UniProtKB/Swiss-Prot annotation:
This is Olfactory receptor 1493. Residues 49-55, 119-137, 218-234, 291-312 are cytoplasmic. Glycans are attached at residue 3. It comes from Rattus norvegicus. It comes from the Eukaryota. GO terms for biological process: signal transduction. The chain crosses the membrane at residues 24-48, 56-77, 99-118, 138-156, 195-217, 235-258, 271-290. It is a multi-pass membrane protein.
Length: 312
């Protein structure tokens, strides 16, 4: 029988960075984090300040940007601290806290992608009824439901993880406290934890993904009924950004969790985890903004209005 012990901290050894390269990686990750933070913050601020962006699509986009901002902060701030201090560790309480917020904002972004897909479906397939269907009340209710579901989901998994017992091994082969890695260290029975992960995984990941696929299948079906260059261009212009983000989000998750290698959280696993915790949130503002005329015009309006309001 394994000897159980009280674990006060975990070592995060998912990114074995040589000491001579510590500062280089610190600068790289800091730039990536600041790009993520400022890019997503800009979208949130623009949607709040510009009345032209007070639409369902940009309401969901601003919430997605806020979610991405927080999602990246959950892992990156601790990673930067560990690289700078050269002590890659996290306390037991800090680990559970990180798991809670990681799940909360990760799955919140997942549901927001579903809402945005539904918004595009209604806009393209039912343009005359769009305002009535995508009412402010419906959007607010959806956001409230998303927050409640993801908070409950994150709290359930965190509480289940808190009841686990651990042996002497406190090494987590990742750069943050990942629930899957934590379960591998547990000495106590993890059947309930794994069962709930699979059950909730279907509800939180699989069902939303299916809903997104159905939404776009209906959009494509609607366009094919009246094929024209203008309608096809409209679909790509309104859905291209969203499809890119969906592909990034689900592509990395499928590659990491559904198609694992022999050692799921080896260096390869940590690199893939870096993709969806850091790279995807960093790219989202560029994907949604660079070719988005509304966002560019909003930035110009907000910037010009601030200049005009200055006393000099």
């Amino acid at each position: 029988m394994n000897n159980k012990t009280v674990i006060t901290h975990f070592l995060l050894l998912g990114l074995p960075i040589p000491p001579e390269h510590q500062q280089l990686f610190f600068a790289l990750f800091l730039i990536m984090y600041l790009t993520t933070f400022l890019g997503n913050l800009l979208i949130v601020v623009l949607v709040q300040l510009d009345s032209h962006l007070h639409t369902p699509m940009y309401l969901f986009l601003s919430n997605l940007s806020f979610s991405d901002l927080c999602f990246s902060s959950v892992t990156m701030l601790k990673l930067l601290q560990n690289i700078q201090s050269q002590v890659p560790s996290i306390s037991y309480a800090g680990c559970l806290t990180q798991i809670f917020f990681f799940l909360l904002f990760g799955y919140l972004g997942n549901f927001l992608l579903v809402a945005m897909a539904y918004d595009r479906y209604v806009a393209i397939c039912f343009p005359l009824h769009y305002t009535n269907i995508m009412s402010h009340k419906l959007c607010t209710c959806l956001l409230l439901v998303f927050w409640i579901m993801t908070s409950s989901h994150a709290m359930m998994h965190t509480l289940l993880a808190a009841r686990l017992s651990f042996c002497e091994n406190n090494v987590l082969l990742n750069f943050f406290c990942d629930l899957f890695v934590l379960l591998k260290l547990a000495c106590s029975d993890t059947y309930v934890n794994e069962l709930m992960i699979h059950i909730m995984g279907v509800i939180i990941i699989v069902i939303p993904f299916v809903l997104i696929v159905i939404s776009y299948a209906k959009i494509i079906s609607s366009i094919l009924k009246v094929p024209s260059t203008q309608s096809i261009h409209k679909v790509f212009s309104t859905c291209g950004s969203h499809l890119s983000v969906v592909s990034l989000f689900y592509g990395t998750i499928i590659g990491l969790y559904l198609c694992p290698s022999g050692d799921n959280f080896s260096l390869k696993g940590s690199a893939m985890a870096m993709m969806y915790t850091v790279v995807t949130p960093m790219l989202n503002p560029f994907i949604y903004s660079l070719r988005n005329r509304d966002m560019k015009q909003a930035l110009i309006r907000v910037t010009c209005s601030k200049k005009i309001s200055l006393p000099w």
